[in-house]
């Protein structure tokens, strides 16, 4: 893998890293809210690159080494994060890319496919949602966690790590694949390279989100693969089923014994599925 690099994309500085050979089909990995590039683990990226893909991961604004903003005052909206993805393709001189988005990143990927279809070779949507009042609600446990007004002391790295670990445990929905002892060092490493922990954990939830993408799903014209945990407590399976119905020719793969996370145990399904889906340029 290449060293991390600060790139000028969509008018801001974003930190990105690449794996594999530039001549191979490009995959841009777009993660969810409050997550830096490290949420796409090194081994996951390496497995995709070993399948002859040029893999790009990056830090969203307010995560990792990318541009930061004051806590509670993000100087951007959801649309800006979507344009950041296209800006990274520009910065890397990539005319097109296969977009792989997880959670919020899936929404950004769908938005990019709608607004910049000529730049998007395909979509892979992991644990994401198109939004809509008719879709199943979050689990009571997750909703209680995210609406709890009590916040940890973000200046205390241990307290921040405890908070994130609790959130991920709830997202895992009791999956036997969740290992808190292995997860905690990954969280600590991610937080250690974050400019402002409070901003990273608050600002993506404070930004303006814009209009729901649901009414426009039928306009998506790029090949679309949907990978979704059967036990997802954040976006229950009905969210994925709605996308599979409403995005033309979309294909849904349900991940057994899986919640909102993408644990290593399901990579044996996820990685080959992505490689097969992105075999064209």
Question: Regions from the language model: what does each represent?
Answer:
Residues 121-155:
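Flexible "cap/lid" loop of the alpha/beta hydrolase fold
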Residues 233-239:
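Conserved alpha/beta-hydrolase "acid-adjacent" motif
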Residues 250-281:
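Catalytic active-site module of serine/aspartate enzymes centered on a nucleophile-bearing elbow/loop
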Residues 106-117, 123:
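Short glycine-enriched nucleophile-adjacent loop
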Residues 63-100:
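Active-site loop/oxyanion-hole signature of alpha/beta-hydrolase fold enzymes
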């Amino acid at each position: 893998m290449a060293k991390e690099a600060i790139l000028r994309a969509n008018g801001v500085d974003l930190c990105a890293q690449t794996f594999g050979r530039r001549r191979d089909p490009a995959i841009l990995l777009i993660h969810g809210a409050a997550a830096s590039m490290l949420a796409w683990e090194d081994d996951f990226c390496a497995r995709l690159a070993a399948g002859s893909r040029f893999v790009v991961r990056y830090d969203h604004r307010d995560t990792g080494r990318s541009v930061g903003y004051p806590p509670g005052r993000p100087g951007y909206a959801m649309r800006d994060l979507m344009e950041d993805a296209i800006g990274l393709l520009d910065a890397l001189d990539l005319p097109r890319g296969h977009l792989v988005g997880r959670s919020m990143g899936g929404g950004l990927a769908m938005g990019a496919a709608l607004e910049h279809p000529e730049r998007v070779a395909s979509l892979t949507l992991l644990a994401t949602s198109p939004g809509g009042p008719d879709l199943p609600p979050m689990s009571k446990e997750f909703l209680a966690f995210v609406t709890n007004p009590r916040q940890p002391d973000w200046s205390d790295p241990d307290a921040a790590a405890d908070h994130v670990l609790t959130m991920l445990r709830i997202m895992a929905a009791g999956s036997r694949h969740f290992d808190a002892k292995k997860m905690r060092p990954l969280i600590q490493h991610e937080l250690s390279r974050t400019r402002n922990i409070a901003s990273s954990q608050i600002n993506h939830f404070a930004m303006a989100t814009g209009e729901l993408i649901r009414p426009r799903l039928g306009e998506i014209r790029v090949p679309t693969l949907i990978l979704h945990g059967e036990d997802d407590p954040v976006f229950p399976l009905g969210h994925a089923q709605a996308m599979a119905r409403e995005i033309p020719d979309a294909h849904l793969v349900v991940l057994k014994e899986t919640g909102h996370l993408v644990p290593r145990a399901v990579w044996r399904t996820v990685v080959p599925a992505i490689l097969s889906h992105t075999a064209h340029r």
